[in-house]
């Protein structure tokens, strides 16, 4: 094993001057999987996050300090909420000596759901992404949730003597936040406006309820995005959003799709 002479100073190549004089808007690490503890209404919950972390690199600096991104995660293992996430990106800018940066973390989020008739409980998973962007002295916060629901076609119901085609749909909401909003509140906005929500475990009486609930509440993909948009528009914690609905049509080999984008600052 080679011993390092304590008098030897290892060169810091990353901090050397770059003569090409080209700014790099975003440089960092991508796809870092790390244990993650979330602060939720039910308490601390463990999951696994996939992190993308980057900073702006000045034109005269050769490289960023890649190891500091992972060190930041290792040294910040406390339960995460929006305030802690905002502080994390601020800490990253200090450590990387940067004036702009971005952290994105995606993770599965599980909610305990109670079946509508039998009362049996089960977990249902949702795909969630948090983003904190720091630039020009301001930090913007974003939350994305993909919510699976059931949709039932109003046209199919209207023209058929019995039954109607229905399918699973994905509602994806990417919201820019002006205040604290927990994941479960965002999920509820989508589930409550769908033909019916989903559960991980259902008994026969529950299946009857779900079937009839969807039949009594038919919605086109256009209805889904418009009804959810009404909820997002009325929530002062949300300043802007992109809302997508995709119905995986049971009678076609393609999806029905709709998008609404809205920024309340530019009404």
Curated annotation (Swiss-Prot):
It is an enzyme of class 3 (hydrolase). InterPro entries: GTP_cyclohydrolase_FolE2, GTP_cyclohydrolase_FolE2/MptA. Keywords: Hydrolase. The record marks 153 as: May be catalytically important. Pfam families: GCHY-1 (PF02649). It catalyses: GTP + H2O = 7,8-dihydroneopterin 3'-triphosphate + formate + H(+). Pathway: Cofactor biosynthesis; 7,8-dihydroneopterin triphosphate biosynthesis; 7,8-dihydroneopterin triphosphate from GTP: step 1/1. One of its GO terms (biological process) is tetrahydrofolate biosynthetic process. It comes from the Bacteria. One of its GO terms (molecular function) is GTP cyclohydrolase I activity. Its EC number is 3.5.4.16. Belongs to the GTP cyclohydrolase IV family. Converts GTP to 7,8-dihydroneopterin triphosphate. This is GTP cyclohydrolase FolE2 2.
């Amino acid at each position: 094993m080679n011993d390092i002479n304590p008098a030897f100073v290892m060169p810091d190549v990353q901090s050397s001057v770059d003569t090409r004089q080209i700014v790099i808007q975003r440089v960092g690490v991508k796809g870092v999987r790390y244990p993650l503890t979330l602060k939720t209404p039910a308490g601390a919950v463990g999951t696994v996050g996939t992190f993308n972390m980057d900073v702006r690199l000045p034109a005269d600096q050769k490289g960023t300090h890649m190891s500091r991104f992972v060190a930041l995660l290792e040294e910040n293992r406390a339960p995460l909420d929006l305030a802690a996430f905002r502080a994390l990106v601020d800490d990253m800018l200090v450590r990387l000596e940067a004036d702009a940066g971005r952290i994105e973390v995606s993770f599965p989020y599980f909610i305990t759901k109670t079946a509508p008739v039998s009362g049996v409980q089960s977990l249902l998973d949702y795909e969630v992404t948090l983003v904190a962007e720091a630039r020009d002295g301001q930090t913007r916060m974003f939350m994305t949730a993909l919510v699976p629901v059931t949709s039932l076609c109003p046209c199919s119901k209207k023209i058929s003597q019995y039954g109607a085609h229905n399918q699973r749909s994905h509602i994806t909401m990417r919201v820019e936040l002006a205040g604290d909003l927990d994941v479960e509140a965002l999920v509820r906005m989508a589930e409550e406006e769908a033909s019916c929500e989903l559960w991980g475990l259902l008994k026969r009486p529950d299946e009857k309820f779900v079937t009839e609930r969807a039949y009594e509440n038919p919605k086109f993909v256009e209805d889904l995005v418009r009804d959810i948009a009404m909820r997002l528009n009325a929530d002062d914690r949300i300043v802007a959003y992109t809302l997508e609905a995709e119905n995986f049509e049971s009678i076609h080999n393609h999806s029905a799709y709709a998008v609404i984008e809205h920024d309340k600052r530019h009404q």
